[in-house]
Amino acid sequence: MADCAAPVGVFDSGVGGLSVLREIRQRLPHESLLYLADSAHVPYGEKSPEYIRERCRVIAAFFVEKGAKALVVACNTATAAGVTELRELYPQLPIIAMEPAVKPAALATRSGVVGVLATTGTLKSAKFAALLDRFAADVRVITQPCPGLVERIEAGDLESADTRAMLMGWVEPMLAQGCDTLILGCTHYPFIRPLLQQLLPNDIRLIDTGAAVARHLREMLAERHLLASGDATQRFYCSGDPQRMARVLPILWGENAVVEFFPS
C-alpha cells in the first residue's frame, strides 16, 4: 500500500510538462511532486516510438525507485508511444496520461473546423487517429506539425518576432479555412497561449488538457485513499543541462528551484 505522503512523479521530454505541473500544484497543493525533464532527448516528437518507449521505461523505473505513488506522463508523444507498456509493467501504479483534446474541441467548435498544433510523433500515432475516429467524425480537423517550436519554448523564447512569425505561418492557413477552435496538442504549447491570444481573433478558442489531467489525478488518488494532507515539496530533475533548466524555471514555473542532474 502506497503512502499518502509519497510523491507524484511527472515527466516530459523537456520543460513543457511544467504546464501540467502548474495545474497539479494549483488543484492539489498538498501533493509532493517529482518532475523530470528528459531534455537530453528532446524533442520526443521527432524520435521513433521504440526510442520513446525506452525513455519511458527508464524514467518510470526512476520514479518507482523514488517511491512515487502515481505517475503522470505529461507528454502527448510519450503517451502515444509508451503509456500502454508502462501500464503493463506497473499494473498497481496509477498512471495518468495526456492526449490531444479532440473531444472537447469537437464539442466546442461552431464552424465545424478544428485545428491541431502538435508534434509529428503525436499526429502520426495510432492513438491520435483513434481519437479522430471516435470524437471528430462530424467535424473537419486540420493538423499542423510544429517542428522547432518545442526547442524555442525550451529556451524560454515565448514571444520573439521569430516565434510570432512561426506561429502565424501555421495558424493563418487554418483560419482561412474556417477554423474557430485550436487544440494545443503538446504540453509545451500552453506556454505560448498568451502569444496566440495576441495573434488570433478573440473568438478563436484555445484548448489544452492540463487542467483535465490534474482533475483526473485527483480522482485517481481519492479513489485509492492516497490524497496527501501535509506540506508539499517539489524536486526537479533534468537529463540535459540542469543550469539551463534552472534559468527558465522562473519563466515557466514561476519561481526559482534547484535542478538535479538525471544521468541517462
UniProtKB/Swiss-Prot annotation:
Pathway stated in the Swiss-Prot or TrEMBL entry: Cell wall biogenesis; peptidoglycan biosynthesis
Record has Transit peptide as a keyword: no
Catalytic activity: L-glutamate = D-glutamate
Superkingdom of origin organism: Bacteria
Keywords associated with the record: Cell shape, Cell wall biogenesis/degradation, Isomerase, Peptidoglycan synthesis
Main EC class the enzyme belongs to: isomerase
The protein's Enzyme Commission number: 5.1.1.3
Pfam families per UniProt: Asp_Glu_race
GO MF annotation terms: glutamate racemase activity
InterPro entries recorded: Asp/Glu/hydantoin_racemase, Asp/Glu_race, Asp/Glu_racemase_AS_1, Asp/Glu_racemase_AS_2, Glu_race
Residues annotated as catalytic: 75 (proton donor/acceptor), 186 (proton donor/acceptor)
Residues that hold substrate according to the record: 12-13, 44-45, 76-77, 187-188
PROSITE patterns: ASP_GLU_RACEMASE_1 (PS00923), ASP_GLU_RACEMASE_2 (PS00924)
Gene Ontology annotations of biological process type: cell wall organization; peptidoglycan biosynthetic process; regulation of cell shape
Similarity comment: Belongs to the aspartate/glutamate racemases family.
Its biological purpose: Provides the (R)-glutamate required for cell wall biosynthesis.
HAMAP family named among the record's database cross-references: Glu_racemase (MF_00258)
Full protein name: Glutamate racemase
Provenance organism: Stutzerimonas stutzeri (strain A1501)
